[in-house]
């Protein structure tokens, strides 16, 4: 009985196995009919599966991998969308020529962007792209290339990057090529920066005075001295004779003049504030005499000048005054603000529209001063005075000093001018932050200097210190950066140039007095060493001329000497042959008199 049951079980098992093999073979045949690229498997009678089927598909498709197998629910949609419906009865592979034609037809499909967007709307979208992004878009398709190489886009890029600001769109026919020509000298100047290859000039000093303050704008330098004199240089032309800007007090009282406390300059105006509270404003285009004079009752503690508009802000005692001309061109007091403490730092916010906006720090108070409005407190924490200040078009950055371990060290606070709230708290250093630069820094980056002798590069997106450089022997007094380098000045008189991408110091120069001012552009650098003491020191009591080492220094570095050599020779090369002054500069010049 048991043998009979066992035999019956074996027979049923063999029938089920045979039936399952028939079903499996039928399914494979149906699948082979649905896919016309691999019909040989059904013709051979043994369907290929797994890795064997993949290899056969690669061989039959001439190196092209087989398309993924569609699901059961998508097979009807795929067959309905195909360009040529598959022949279920065909058993031969598709010719390679037909496959090539079908692939070319698929490449002719136009992207959605090209079909549905008008050309004018595409231009408006592409105007927010930079040079690199436009180059990438030109590689997408022919239509995108036409849009990405539109002359209007490259004309706007050329203007945004500061090239040919006074040119019109009709002046050139290929603005992309013009931008390439404008950028070519920049790539040639960078090696000169890295190797300190160029010309250095020490601006002529007033012999009987000590340097008090220095500022510059687009190569034009202004300096004030203890003798009350204000001098202007144009470093863009080597043969420029620096004039003195005269004041009305010199004509009234020809004796000892008050010290110059602050000087400021922009493209058209020069401003100087004196120790006795006098403020003079000169128009650089009209003459050497001031066009406006304003007098405070007390000493001027801070001075600011807008770089775009004729707007001047001064702080004296507990008052902050904004001055600018009216519609007739007459200067007047436009706004006056009262603050609770003496002002330490004062800056005018750029690009504010009709009404100018200023930022003032007074002890532990930071004020937002808008013309035609009252003073508003932007920041206040008792016992945390501000130690430095800088502003950009949308943000203000200032260092705060922490008194005690509770506040976790000194920081730099970044505020939004539009929202009037704190965006970032950066730093956490033991020393006081002595300088910060957000106006000239690349987007989302900021550089600062500290009394702990370190220069810090801050990433505003992460609120972290991206780089920290041990730059100076004493505290850092001035700092500025661009897209690849940092230039810093220290209290010991050292000017250092860093390539922060490689975390490497390129070169440095040293002078006697602290570095109080640094400004550079793509091809030039201006530094000023201002002494601590403003008193004349000389061993000869009968001679009031100040010794050279106590005056202070202003240096102008030019790294595009090859370009300037065709415009005018250097001053040392214009000396006559019978003088020996040309050999006292310790410069390795080859044939300095060949240009005569």
Swiss-Prot record:
Span list, region Disordered: 21-95
Subcellular location: Cytoplasm, Perinuclear region; Golgi apparatus; Cytoplasm, Cytosol
Keyword Nucleotide-binding: no
Gene Ontology CC: 3M complex; centriole; ciliary basal body; Cul7-RING ubiquitin ligase complex; cytoplasm; cytosol; Golgi apparatus; perinuclear region of cytoplasm
Compositional bias per record (Basic and acidic residues), positions renumbered to this chain: 29-43, 71-91
PANTHER family linked to this entry: POC1 CENTRIOLAR PROTEIN HOMOLOG, WD REPEAT-CONTAINING PROTEIN 55
Protein name: F-box/WD repeat-containing protein 8
Gene source species: Rattus norvegicus (Rat)
Name of the gene encoding the protein in the UniProt record: Fbxw8
């Amino acid at each position: 009985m048991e043998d009979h049951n066992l035999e019956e079980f074996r027979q049923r098992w063999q029938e089920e196995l045979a039936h399952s093999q028939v079903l499996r073979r039928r399914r494979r045949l149906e699948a082979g009919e649905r896919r016309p690229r691999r019909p040989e498997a059904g013709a051979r009678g043994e369907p290929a599966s797994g890795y064997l089927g993949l290899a056969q598909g690669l061989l039959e498709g001439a190196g092209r991998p087989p398309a993924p197998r569609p699901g059961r629910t998508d097979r009807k949609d795929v067959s309905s969308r195909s360009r040529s419906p598959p022949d279920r009865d065909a058993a031969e592979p598709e010719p390679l020529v037909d496959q090539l034609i079908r692939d070319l037809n698929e490449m002719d499909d136009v992207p959605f962007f090209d079909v549905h967007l008008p050309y004018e709307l595409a231009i408006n979208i592409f105007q927010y792209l930079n040079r690199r992004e436009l180059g990438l878009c030109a590689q997408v398709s022919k239509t995108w290339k036409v849009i990405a190489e539109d002359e209007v886009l490259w004309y706007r890029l050329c203007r945004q990057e500061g090239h040919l600001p006074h040119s019109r769109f009709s002046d050139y026919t290929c603005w992309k090529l013009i931008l390439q020509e404008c950028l070519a000298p920049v790539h040639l100047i960078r090696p000169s920066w890295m190797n300190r290859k160029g010309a250095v000039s020490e601006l002529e000093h007033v012999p009987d005075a000590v340097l008090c303050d220095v500022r510059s704008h687009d190569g034009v330098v202004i300096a004030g001295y203890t003798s009350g004199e204000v001098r202007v240089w144009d470093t863009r032309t080597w043969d420029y004779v620096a004039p003195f800007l005269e004041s009305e007090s010199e004509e009234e009282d020809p004796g000892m003049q008050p010290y110059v406390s602050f000087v400021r300059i922009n493209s058209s105006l020069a401003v100087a504030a004196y120790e006795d509270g006098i403020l003079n404003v000169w128009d650089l285009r009209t003459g050497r005499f001031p066009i406006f004079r304003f007098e405070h009752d007390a000493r001027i503690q801070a001075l600011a000048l807008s770089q775009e508009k004729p707007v001047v802000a001064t702080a004296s005692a507990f008052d902050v005054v904004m001055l600018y001309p009216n519609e007739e061109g007459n200067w007047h007091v436009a706004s006056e603000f009262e603050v609770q403490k003496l002002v330490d730092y004062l800056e005018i916010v750029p690009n504010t529209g009709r009404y100018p906006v200023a930022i003032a720090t007074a002890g532990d108070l930071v004020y937002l001063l808008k013309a035609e409005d009252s003073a508003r407190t932007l920041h206040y924490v008792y016992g945390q005075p501000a130690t430095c200040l800088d502003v950009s078009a949308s943000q203000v950055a200032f260092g705060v000093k922490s008194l005690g371990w509770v506040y976790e060290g000194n920081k730099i606070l970044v505020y939004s001018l539009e929202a009037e709230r704190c965006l970032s708290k950066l730093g956490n250093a033991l020393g006081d932050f002595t300088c910060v630069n957000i106006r000239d820094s690349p987007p989302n980056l900021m550089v600062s200097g500290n009394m702990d002798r370190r220069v810090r590069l801050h990433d505003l997106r992460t609120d972290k210190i991206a780089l920290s450089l041990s730059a100076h022997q004493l505290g850092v007094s001035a700092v500025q950066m661009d897209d690849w380098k940092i230039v810093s000045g220290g209290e010991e008189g050292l000017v250092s140039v860093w390539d922060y991408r490689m975390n490497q110091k390129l070169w440095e120069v040293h002078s006697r007095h602290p570095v109080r001012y640094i400004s550079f552009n793509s091809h030039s650098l201006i530094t000023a060493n201002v002494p601590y003491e403003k008193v004349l020191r000389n061993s000869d009591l009968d001679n009031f001329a100040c010794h050279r080492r106590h005056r202070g220094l202003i240096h102008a570095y030019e790294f595009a000497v090859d370009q300037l050599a065709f415009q005018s020779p250097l001053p040392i090369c214009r000396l006559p042959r019978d003088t020996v002054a040309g050999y006292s500069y310790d410069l390795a010049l080859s044939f300095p008199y060949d240009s005569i």
